[in-house]
Structure formats: C-alpha cells, structure tokens
C-alpha cells in the first residue's frame, strides 16, 4: 500500500513562522531607527569647542562635578559677564575659605559675589536650587549655565522646566580628559554620550508626563 505524504501543514507552519520573524524585525526596526536617530541628534547638540564669546546675564549657575566647571564659572564672573554666581551641589563642609584656597586668583569675586548651594544631589536638585536662587535675588531675565558639554542638554531641559521664561545661556565646559575626543571617533565619548542620552530621554518623558494637558 502506497503511503501518502501531505506537506500542506508544514508549508503553513513555515509561512506562519516567516510572518512572525517579519513582524519581529519590523517592530525592532520601528524602535531602533528613531532610537539611533535620536542618539545622533543628541550627540550633535553637544558642543566640542571652547566658548569664545558669551552674552552678559544677571547671574551664573555652576553645576558641580569637576574643578574645570568651577574655574570656568569664576573666570566668567571675574570678566564681568554677570554680577553673582551660584555653585550648586557643593559637598557638605566646603566653604568660601576652601574656594579661595583652591582658586586664589579669584579671591575678590569669591568673597563678594559667590554663593554655595548644598542641597542639590542631582540635576533636578540643581534646577531647584537655581529656582530658589533666582527668587532670592529677584532674577528674571537671563542666567549663564556652566556645566560639562555632554551634561548641558539635560541641564538646560531640567532648568528650563524649573525656571520657565528666564533665558538660559549655555557655557559648556569640555573636561580635560575629553578634549579632542568626539562621539564618532572615541569609544569612551560615545559611551558617555549614550548614557547621557538615556538620562535625557527619561527626564524628557518625566517632564512630559508632568506637564498639564492642553484643552
């Protein structure tokens, strides 16, 4: 007796499997294309050049995280680009005397025009300290924001959400170890920017969810 073979069920199974793979790949590409595109956009927002000119503002906000940031902020203050400066996120126990020891060339401006903020533990806290600082001194026009170049986009996002209509003038600081490195030719820089890109995205979604609905 001849045995009959029916391949129709196998063919249907293969077709279903192929569609599943196509659906998976389509879903993956739908996620990856905007994600990678967003990363490239974010990386291009970061400045890799030292600031040559800067507008005058009412005050300067320096976010701690490196001596370069503080030094550059004090330099901008001493050049007369603002009347006062807040260093946000200072560790407990640090005071003005420590500042003058570390930056003796800026003793005069430290003694007259620098405030230290101790409450901030992160970028959100920096924005909150900046808001309290502006209210305390009646500032409402423009601030110079000093932080590392890779940290600037998220800093501006959080600070703008906190301060509202006050103009924010970025003063990106390029850390010494990262000078001459770009996201397209340095694995370390690419990783650093990738982590910051994720943090920026999470901050953006949090602020978007918190925003009041428009009717």
Model feature map: region roles:
Residues 1-19:
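N-terminal Lys/Arg-rich, disordered targeting/topogenic segments
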Residues 4, 214-215:
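Amphipathic, soluble alpha/beta structural segments
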Residues 8-11, 33, 40-43:
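Short, contiguous, well-ordered secondary-structure segments
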Residues 23-39:
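Hydrophobic membrane-insertion alpha-helices, especially the h-region
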Residues 15-25, 186-190, 194:
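Structural motif marking the loop-to-transmembrane transition
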Residues 40-187:
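A structural signal for short, hydrophobic/glycine-enriched beta-strand patches
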Residues 185-213:
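A transmembrane-helix-recognition feature enriched in membrane-embedded lipid enzymes
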Residues 4, 18-20, 40, 182-183:
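Residues in intrinsically disordered, low-complexity segments of regulatory proteins
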């Amino acid at each position: 007796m001849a045995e009959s073979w029916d391949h129709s069920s196998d063919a249907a199974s293969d077709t279903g499997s192929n569609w599943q793979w196509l659906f998976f790949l389509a879903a993956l590409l739908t996620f990856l294309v905007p994600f990678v595109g967003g990363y490239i956009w974010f990386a291009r927002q970061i400045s890799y050049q030292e600031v040559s000119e800067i507008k005058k503002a009412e005050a300067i906000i320096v976010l701690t995280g490196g001596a370069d940031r503080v030094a550059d902020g004090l330099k901008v203050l001493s050049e007369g680009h603002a009347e006062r400066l807040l260093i946000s996120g200072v560790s407990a126990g640090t005071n003005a005397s420590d500042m003058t020891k570390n930056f003796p060339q800026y003793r005069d401006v430290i003694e007259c025009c620098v405030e230290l903020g101790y409450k901030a533990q992160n970028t959100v806290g920096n924005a909150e300290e900046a808001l309290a600082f502006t209210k305390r001194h009646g500032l409402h026009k423009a601030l110079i924001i000093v932080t590392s170049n890779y940290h600037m986009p998220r800093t501006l996002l959080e600070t703008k959400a906190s301060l509202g209509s006050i103009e924010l003038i970025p003063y990106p600081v390029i850390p010494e170890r990262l000078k001459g490195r770009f996201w397209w030719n340095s694995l370390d820089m690419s990783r650093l920017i990738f982590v910051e890109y994720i943090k920026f995205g999470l901050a953006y979604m949090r602020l978007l969810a918190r925003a009041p609905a428009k009717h």
